[in-house]
Structure formats: structure tokens, C-alpha cells
């Protein structure tokens, strides 16, 4: 993939960059795998804002992605590589030999015409999905399950890959992109390779309008508000926030305050936290 850099014809264009989408082969998605996506604008069923800075954006349809990869032993041929507005990674439309069509997260290097397969007997090749117990130690994987048969939950975004570090007993040790090292059951499935669109993280949005088209509204600083709207608000001119450490709009500690439960069930499965 390539990154397009724009000439500084306007102030917003100066540091703007965009994807060239060289891997994309079609702009027409498979209609049978599309469903309507209702926008909430960050509101709950009572109409109250529960997630700030959401709203607007371009209309989009949701692409049904096969995260389970449970069609074992049946080869599938890659028909197209497509853009998905709902995620940072590209997706691939695969057609099985029995005629069924499914979308999968496209790994880096997957091309139209490639054949992929799922199941314990699959080869160690990008795009193939196997139980972790059948994957060699040291292999880079993505789309990792946390519970067998539930579907992939880890390492699904653009450019992501985890490394299989060890296998012992019923558990495998996996190093995640965040730096966290944790145990995963060896019956859980993972897909070989790295997620596509690896240069996504170095792209610069460049201007506010592109962010609005993505469905994000502006984030206003608390110190720019009135005291009735935020604990940091008020004061004459540009004043400090007037407290020892920053807080959220609701008065809870912010920036550095640990929000993870101290006795979470998965603590025993995490060997090394990403911040350690």
C-alpha cells in the first residue's frame, strides 16, 4: 500500500496524507453481506448522551465479517479486496467451493485469486485459520479468539499482529501488539499473518472536516468552558485549572488514574501488562 502526500495548497493540506488504496480491487460490496447501520449519535434509549463527541458522518452499511472461520476443510478463493468504512483494516470477499460467500479481515499480502482454508490441517500460510495448538511457536498471527468458537476478539485492526511465544499444557503464551503478554487456550483459533493496511498509523487526518465525515464531533477543552459545564472552567483569561490534578467533566480523576478492576477474572491470564 502507499501513502499520498498533498502539496500545501491550503493550511489544512500542508500536513495531510491519505491512503492510495492500491490493494482495493472493487468499490461495489457484496449486497447479500450488507445490513443497515443505525446511527445513535452517542445517545442511549432515553436520548441522553452517553458517549461524547459522536454524531453526523457519512452514511454507511455494515459488512458482515466472518470472525469464526468455522467452515473447515473447504477451500475458498479470494474474489475481491475491499474497503470497509467500519474498520481500519481492508476486507476480502472469499467464495467457497460450495458457492457460499463470506467477508474476512484481509491479511497483508493476500491477493485476488489466492486460496485460503480453515481447520486444524490447514497450511501455515497467510489467511489460513487454525487452532493455536496447530500453529508453530514464533508465528505471527491475528484475529485471535479468547473463547473457543466465540469468534476472533483480539488483533483485528490495521497492521496488527501478535506473536505466539510458547505452548504449555492447555494454554499458549501470546505477545500482543500493545506489549501485553497473556495466556490463551490452545483450542482457540487464530489466523496466520499480519492485518492489512499496515501504514494506517502514519496517516495524518490533516483537517477537521475529514474527522467530521467519520462521525466525530469536536472535543472542547474543559478550561475553555464555564464552571457550570466543567470543573476546569471559569476564571479570568487563560487561567490554570485550579486543582492539583485534572478531572473529568463529572469530577473523577483523569490522566493516569487506573480504571481497570482490581480483581478482574482475566488477571490470572495476563503475564505482563502493557504498562509494566
From Swiss-Prot:
The gene is rplB. GO terms for cellular component: large ribosomal subunit. One of the primary rRNA binding proteins. Required for association of the 30S and 50S subunits to form the 70S ribosome, for tRNA binding and peptide bond formation. It has been suggested to have peptidyltransferase activity; this is somewhat controversial. Makes several contacts with the 16S rRNA in the 70S ribosome. GO terms for biological process: cytoplasmic translation. This is Large ribosomal subunit protein uL2. Keywords: Ribonucleoprotein, Ribosomal protein, RNA-binding, rRNA-binding. SUPFAM superfamilies: Nucleic acid-binding proteins, Translation proteins SH3-like domain. Belongs to the universal ribosomal protein uL2 family. It comes from Clostridium tetani (strain Massachusetts / E88). Transmembrane segments: none annotated. GO terms for molecular function: rRNA binding; structural constituent of ribosome; transferase activity.
Amino acid at each position: 500500500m502507499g501513502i499520498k502526500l498533498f502539496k500545501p495548497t491550503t493550511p489544512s493540506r500542508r500536513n495531510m496524507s491519505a491512503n492510495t488504496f492500491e490493494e482495493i480491487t472493487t468499490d461495489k460490496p457484496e449486497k447479500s453481506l450488507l445490513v443497515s447501520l443505525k446511527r445513535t449519535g452517542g445517545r442511549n434509549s432515553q436520548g441522553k448522551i452517553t458517549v461524547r463527541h459522536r454524531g453526523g458522518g457519512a452514511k454507511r452499511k455494515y459488512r458482515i465479517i466472518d470472525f469464526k472461520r468455522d467452515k473447515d476443510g473447504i477451500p475458498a478463493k479470494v474474489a475481491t479486496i475491499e474497503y470497509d468504512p467500519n474498520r481500519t483494516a481492508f476486507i476480502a470477499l472469499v467464495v467457497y467451493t460450495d458457492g457460499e460467500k463470506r467477508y474476512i479481515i484481509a491479511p497483508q499480502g493476500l491477493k485476488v485469486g489466492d486460496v485460503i482454508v480453515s481447520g486444524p490441517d490447514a497450511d501455515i500460510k497467510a489467511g489460513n485459520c487454525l487452532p493455536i495448538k496447530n500453529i508453530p511457536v514464533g508465528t505471527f498471527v491475528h484475529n485471535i479468539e479468547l473463547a473457543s468458537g466465540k469468534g476472533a476478539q483480539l488483533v483485528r485492526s490495521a497492521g496488527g499482529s501478535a506473536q505466539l511465544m510458547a505452548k504449555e499444557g492447555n494454554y499458549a503464551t501470546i505477545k500482543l501488539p500493545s506489549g501485553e503478554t497473556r495466556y490463551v487456550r490452545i483450542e482457540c483459533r487464530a489466523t496466520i499473518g499480519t492485518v492489512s493496511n499496515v501504514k494506517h498509523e502514519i496517516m495524518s487526518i490533516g483537517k477537521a472536516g475529514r474527522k467530521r465525515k467519520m462521525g466525530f464531533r469536536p472535543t472542547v477543552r474543559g478550561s475553555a468552558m464555564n464552571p457550570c459545564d466543567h470543573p476546569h472552567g471559569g476564571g479570568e483569561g487563560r487561567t490554570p485549572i485550579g486543582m492539583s490534578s485534572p478531572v473529568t467533566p463529572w469530577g473523577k480523576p483523569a490522566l493516569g488514574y487506573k480504571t481497570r478492576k482490581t480483581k478482574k477474572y482475566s488477571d490470572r491470564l495476563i503475564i505482563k501488562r502493557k504498562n509494566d
